[in-house]
């Protein structure tokens, strides 16, 4: 089967095309039925395209994502990103004769997105229906106006092309994309598992009994980890998004510290002055707003030299990693899981990956670690397609699909 997937939960417009060959039973029998999984055999995923249009430069001037600005950009980007994605997948076929569309249903779908209606109408008039079996789309959680843009685009395509829709949970997609390149497909070796989802909008610990069976056991009570990176960076005068900026400067600080035998001699060094909020609480929840405030107090009245900023960045990053690592390992032990699964934009952080790897290699408690490729940690259409491939029995009629900004796994 071929899945066309759409992602617009925040500020990235992502569209991917994924070919998935049926999973056959371990004994070489008939394909596994929809909704069933044979982890002894790996499904054959073939990426036909994965196109992402980023809005980072647009939102840099605001120091963060403005939902209505992001929505406007999605309306501009969806049609051209779809065309590019289908072209890369070799599924784009121009019509020999352009047929003008006069369809009230399509216009009704886009009644709140007139610009997207204009672009979509032109697209449908100009190109043939692609040879895809399903349209998958993120319907939550995320920024509501952004979600609706992607959902309505998918609804219009589904209606006009008569292709069924598979709604996808954005958080579940961050989890399931790990299985695309996973070598071990024995369910007994993978589950139960624990997923740490860390991004600008979410910080959650999710217990996974099996695919489709999730329980959130901990989450942030205020700022998400990625949000803390961004806000700390803003205090330090760094550009949005703050995560990559802090990571780069933290690496410089670490290198400088290694070259300095006595850190006390380094007046700009910040020796564990920043707190690790809730690190030793008896639950699995997080809180990062206090860390952001601590950065504000630490830097107040200080001369923000390059070395000092780099050292604060190192401490901010390490404080966040310390909390994430401690909580995750403790929850993994308490719930007796076999695998830790990382996901979300912050999981692309090299130091976070490094310290998780080291911790799991040195702990007495044996755990598998699944981490997505860095380019699949951030939002993209491919992860939506992968998630949809596990839930093709959950297709819905286009009329019944709606966005849910507060959707839970």
PLM ranges: what are they?
Residues 2-9, 16-19, 46-50, 189-191, ...:
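A short helix-loop
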Residues 139-140, 157, 199, 340-349:
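Glycine-rich beta-strand-to-loop/alpha-helix junction loops that act as flexible
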Residues 174-176, 372-409:
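Glycine-rich phosphate-binding/hydrolytic loop that grips phosphoryl groups
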Residues 167-168, 340, 356-357, 365-384:
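Conserved phosphate-binding/catalytic loops in two-lobed NTP-binding clefts
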């Amino acid at each position: 089967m071929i899945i066309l997937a759409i992602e617009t939960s925040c500020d990235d417009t992502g569209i991917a095309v994924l070919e998935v060959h049926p999973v056959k039973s371990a004994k070489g029998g008939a394909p596994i039925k929809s909704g069933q999984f044979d982890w002894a055999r790996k499904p054959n995923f073939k990426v036909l395209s994965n196109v992402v249009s980023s809005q980072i430069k647009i939102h840099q001037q605001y120091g963060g994502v403005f939902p209505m600005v992001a929505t406007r950009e999605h309306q501009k980007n969806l049609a051209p990103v779809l065309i590019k994605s289908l072209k890369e997948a070799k599924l784009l076929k121009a019509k020999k004769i352009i047929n003008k569309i006069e369809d009230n249903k399509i216009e009704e779908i886009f009644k709140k997105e007139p610009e997207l209606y204009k672009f979509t109408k032109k697209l449908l008039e100009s190109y043939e229906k692609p040879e895809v079996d399903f349209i998958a789309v993120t319907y939550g959680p995320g920024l509501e106006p952004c979600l609706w843009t992607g959902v309505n685009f998918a609804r219009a395509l589904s209606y006009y092309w008569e292709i069924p829709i598979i709604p996808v949970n954005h958080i579940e997609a961050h989890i399931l994309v790990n299985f695309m390149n996973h070598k071990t497909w024995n369910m007994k070796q993978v589950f139960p598992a624990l997923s740490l989802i860390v991004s600008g909008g979410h910080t959650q610990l999710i217990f996974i009994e099996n695919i489709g069976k999730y329980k959130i056991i901990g989450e942030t009570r205020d700022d998400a980890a990625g949000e803390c990176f961004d806000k700390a960076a803003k205090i330090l005068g760094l550009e949005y998004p703050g995560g990559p900026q802090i990571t780069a400067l933290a690496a410089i600080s670490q290198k400088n510290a290694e070259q300095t035998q006595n850190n006390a001699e380094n007046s700009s060094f910040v020796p564990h002055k920043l707190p690790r909020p809730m690190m030793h609480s008896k639950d699995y929840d997080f809180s990062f707003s206090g860390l952001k405030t601590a950065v504000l107090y630490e830097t107040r009245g200080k001369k923000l030299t390059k070395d000092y900023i780099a050292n604060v960045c190192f401490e901010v990053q390490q404080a966040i990693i310390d909390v994430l690592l401690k909580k995750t390992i403790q929850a993994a032990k308490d719930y007796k899981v076999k695998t830790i699964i990382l996901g979300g934009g912050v999981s692309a952080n090299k130091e976070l990956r490094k310290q998780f790897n080291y911790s799991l290699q040195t702990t007495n408690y044996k755990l598998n670690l699944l981490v997505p490729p860095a380019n699949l940690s951030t939002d993209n259409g491919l992860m939506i397609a992968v998630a949809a491939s596990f839930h093709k029995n959950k297709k819905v009629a286009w009329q019944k699909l709606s966005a849910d900004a507060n959707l839970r796994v």
